[in-house]
């Protein structure tokens, strides 16, 4: 009988497939409010989930670090598109001007650049090692100052998105509240999952389940 740990990477890869399908399904609903940003969120979640599955499956440290560079595209993109989705869904799409969009993207783009050039400065993470957990091969790092600044940015815009959705939830009739509650719960689960992983309280030590926490909500929204 296969150990449960062996299935974990494939669960993430399977989740990535669902995210792609949800994104394609949502894309067909254009130009409904928030659809484009939701579809892009699904794409970024797919990148994050798929590459994380590879990261914990492939043993060599050098390979893990290469995969992490691609994975960080999804990590950096998800909160931004969630923020844009919240603005569009709550009727504030007029705020998303080209200048505002560039301003919001500036820091994630810089964080992504720092991640890709991390071997030169180690501002994002350092002391990279591989830890074995049963059949899993986990990347362990010591987070740097730039990583924590990026996390502060991520939490800030996700919390802002949550506040916007809660405000809209309180103003909508009962029939409309169900879908909004799905989004709010998804943000809460994702926020809690990321925080628990960073603080070392993951259900499986060293495994980041954040890419999975948003999937039930995404299915409900789509």
Where are these regions (language model features)?
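Hydrophobic transmembrane alpha-helical segments in integral membrane proteins
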Residues: 1-18, 146-154
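Hydrophobic alpha-helical transmembrane segments of multi-pass membrane proteins
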Residues: 11-29, 36-59, 73-84, 104-122, ...
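Generic alpha-helical transmembrane segments
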Residues: 14-16, 75-79, 149-161, 188, ...
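Alpha-helical transmembrane segments in multipass membrane proteins, preferentially the mid-helix core
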Residues: 20-25, 81-88, 154-172, 221-222
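Membrane-interface helix-boundary motifs at transmembrane edges
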Residues: 25-37, 89-100, 167-179, 206
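Interfacial "cap-and-anchor" motif at the non-cytosolic start of specific transmembrane alpha-helices
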Residues: 39, 52-53, 151, 167-169, ...
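Non-cytosolic membrane-interface motifs at loop->transmembrane helix junctions
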Residues: 62-73, 204-214
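The cytoplasmic-loop to transmembrane-helix boundary for the fourth helix
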Residues: 90-147, 177-187
């Amino acid at each position: 009988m296969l150990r449960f740990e062996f299935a974990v990477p494939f669960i993430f890869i399977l989740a990535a497939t669902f995210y792609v399908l949800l994104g394609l399904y949502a894309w067909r609903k254009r130009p409904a409010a928030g659809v484009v940003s939701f579809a892009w969120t699904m794409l970024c979640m797919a990148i994050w989930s798929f590459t994380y599955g590879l990261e914990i499956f492939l043993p060599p440290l050098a390979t893990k670090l290469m995969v992490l560079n691609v994975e960080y595209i999804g990590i950096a993109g998800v909160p931004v598109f969630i923020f844009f989705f919240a603005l569009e869904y709550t009727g504030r799409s007029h705020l998303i001007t080209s200048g505002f969009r560039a301003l919001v993207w500036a820091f994630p783009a810089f964080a992504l650049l720092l991640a890709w050039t991390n071997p030169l400065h180690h501002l994002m993470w350092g002391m990279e090692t591989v830890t074995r957990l049963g059949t899993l091969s986990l990347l362990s790092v010591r987070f740097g100052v730039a990583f924590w600044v990026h996390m502060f940015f991520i939490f800030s815009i996700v919390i802002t998105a949550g506040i916007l959705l809660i405000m809209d939830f309180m103003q909508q009739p009962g029939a409309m509240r169900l879908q909004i509650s799905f989004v709010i719960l998804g943000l809460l689960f994702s926020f809690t999952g990321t925080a628990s992983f960073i603080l070392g309280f993951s259900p499986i030590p060293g495994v980041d389940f954040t890419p999975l926490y948003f999937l039930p909500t995404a299915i409900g929204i789509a």
